[in-house]
Amino acid sequence: MARVKRAMNARKRHKKVLKLAKGYYGGKSKLFKTANESVIRALRNAYVGRKLKKRDYRKLWIARINAATRMNGLSYSKFMNGIKNAGIDINRKMLSEIAINDPKAFAELVDVAKKQLNA
């Protein structure tokens, strides 16, 4: 069986990992093994972070909507139920923006939800 020399492939792989580890402290930016571990961990954390960011923003929007609806005398869950029954299809991101930037329009939405709940 012929001998396999991996010089160029290994060099390319090492350079790629060390390039990703640029800016890390100490051996994590200089030594391949520790740099590789750090890069793998960093990429995994970045992936998880992108998923968590979506959850965090949704939580933030819900908290903002809840605060605004309680100022208008309704709870978040009742408001969402009333608005859904009224056939108003606005996502939570837009509702939170309306609650912050246009309180009068949001108060009208709360009134629509209240009427729908009473009907």
UniProtKB/Swiss-Prot annotation:
Disulfide linkages recorded for this protein, renumbered to the chain, are: none
Q: Which domain of life is it from?
A: Bacteria
Stretches assigned to coiled coil: none
Q: Which UniProt keywords apply?
A: Ribonucleoprotein, Ribosomal protein, RNA-binding, rRNA-binding
Q: Which GO terms describe its molecular function?
A: rRNA binding; structural constituent of ribosome
* Pfam families membership: Ribosomal_L20
A cellular component annotation (GO) from this entry:
ribosome
Picking any one GO biological process from the record gives: translation
Alphabetical list of InterPro entries matching this protein: Ribosomal_bL20 (IPR005813), RIBOSOMAL_L20_CS (IPR049946), Ribosomal_protein_bL20_C (IPR035566)
Report the function annotation for this chain: Binds directly to 23S ribosomal RNA and is necessary for the in vitro assembly process of the 50S ribosomal subunit. It is not involved in the protein synthesizing functions of that subunit.
Family statement drawn from the similarity comment of this UniProt entry: Belongs to the bacterial ribosomal protein bL20 family.
What NCBIfam families does the database record attribute to this sequence? rplT_bact (TIGR01032)
Question: What name does UniProt use for this protein?
Answer: Large ribosomal subunit protein bL20
Gene source species: Clostridium botulinum (strain ATCC 19397 / Type A)
